[in-house]
């Protein structure tokens, strides 16, 4: 006989509903203005680099879905002590990645795409390890899609070109990341 849990059912419903509603208006309920601005700039970077509006929207939508689902899992205290340790490691790696991204933008001639690719890959792997027991294979593919998209060497080279057309977007992204770090959100 299966054990019934209304709490588990409510969490599943929340994850399902929120994943279907990952639009900009719903994102604003869960994501502050600063984060929203960073997401908007990441969308513009993806759209400009790929020339594909639909793909850029899909990447950002996947990012929002992932953030919401991980937030729901935290809210419902679904992570074990071991997983919470992985979450801490992920948070530290993400913070380190943000600091590195900012440093590469602020200090000329320091950009090293292999460093950024490795940081993004490490973040992806930690996040996958954190949620692998909680999310569907489709959600895990969304995580891979987002991190693989932004760790594309051509995109990173294009983004970090001071003479390139994405430099102003990078400046805004780094500005937003700086604010998140100052506010203790990243």
Swiss-Prot record:
Keywords: Immunity, Innate immunity. It comes from the Eukaryota. The keyword Signal does not apply. One of its GO terms (biological process) is regulation of apoptotic process. GO terms for cellular component: cytoplasm. The keyword Zinc-finger does not apply. The central region was initially thought to constitute a DED (death effector) domain. However, 3D-structure data reveal a previously uncharacterized fold that is different from the predicted fold of a DED (death effector) domain. It consists of a large, hydrophobic central cavity that is poised for cofactor binding. Acts as a negative regulator of innate and adaptive immunity by maintaining immune homeostasis. Negative regulator of Toll-like receptor and T-cell receptor function. Prevents hyperresponsiveness of the immune system and maintains immune homeostasis. Inhibits jun/ap1 and NF-kappa-B activation. Promotes Fas-induced apoptosis. PANTHER family: TUMOR NECROSIS FACTOR ALPHA-INDUCED PROTEIN 8-LIKE PROTEIN 2, TUMOR NECROSIS FACTOR INDUCED PROTEIN. Belongs to the TNFAIP8 family. TNFAIP8L2 subfamily. This is Tumor necrosis factor, alpha-induced protein 8-like protein 2 A. It comes from Danio rerio (Zebrafish).
